[in-house]
């Protein structure tokens, strides 16, 4: 018997905005962290990120998100030893569960996930990385539960976040996720 989720019992609360449509066009700043802040993706050497095999696979999966979610554009991102920061742009709002013309839905294109929210994008990305890690390494749990997102509402915020992402390897030792 499975127990239905109950916030009072499970002590979890959503960190998402209650009435926000996470399919909406716009820019989103995403942070996804490794479980227990483990440094699984490589190391910072001379203020530059040196990716290991898993880190390179994370990079490949992140860059390939638009193949599975054609309404998404990948903007600036950085893979750090124990987390990823990235800007995702939704370039067109998805209407309903499928935004493809009827004649293309089941024939010419590979199957895509039905949900097109930021949450479904992150979920698919995390699942792909975890699956690869389990098959190709001794790592079983890659990610902490959930992810952090910030809706970028103006150019000033976008530019600050863009600069933060670019400087993240340089400022690694001051990062709140830094572990020695």
From Swiss-Prot:
InterPro entries: RAYT_transposase, Transposase_17, Transposase_17_sf. One of its GO terms (molecular function) is transposase activity. One of its GO terms (biological process) is DNA transposition. Coiled coil: none annotated. Gene3D superfamilies: Transposase IS200-like (3.30.70.1290). PANTHER family: REP-ASSOCIATED TYROSINE TRANSPOSASE (PTHR36966:SF1). This is Uncharacterized protein HI_0554. It comes from Haemophilus influenzae (strain ATCC 51907 / DSM 11121 / KW20 / Rd).
């Amino acid at each position: 018997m499975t127990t239905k989720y109950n916030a009072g019992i499970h002590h979890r609360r959503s960190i998402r905005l209650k009435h926000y449509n996470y399919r909406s066009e716009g820019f989103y700043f995403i942070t996804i962290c490794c479980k227990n802040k483990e440094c699984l993706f490589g190391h910072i050497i001379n203020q530059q990120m040196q990716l290991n095999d898993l880190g390179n696979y994370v990079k490949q999966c992140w860059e390939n998100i638009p193949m599975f979610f054609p309404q998404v554009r990948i903007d600036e991102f950085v893979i750090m030893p124990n987390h990823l920061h990235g800007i995702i742009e939704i370039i067109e709002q998805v209407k309903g569960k499928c935004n493809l013309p009827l004649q293309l839905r089941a024939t010419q294109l590979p199957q895509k996930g039905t949900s097109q929210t930021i949450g479904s994008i992150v979920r698919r990305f995390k699942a792909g990385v975890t699956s690869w890690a389990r098959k190709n390494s001794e790592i079983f749990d890659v990610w902490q539960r959930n992810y952090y997102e910030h809706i970028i509402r103006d150019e000033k915020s976008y530019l600050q976040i863009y600069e933060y992402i670019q400087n993240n390897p340089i400022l690694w030792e001051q990062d709140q996720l830094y572990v020695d």
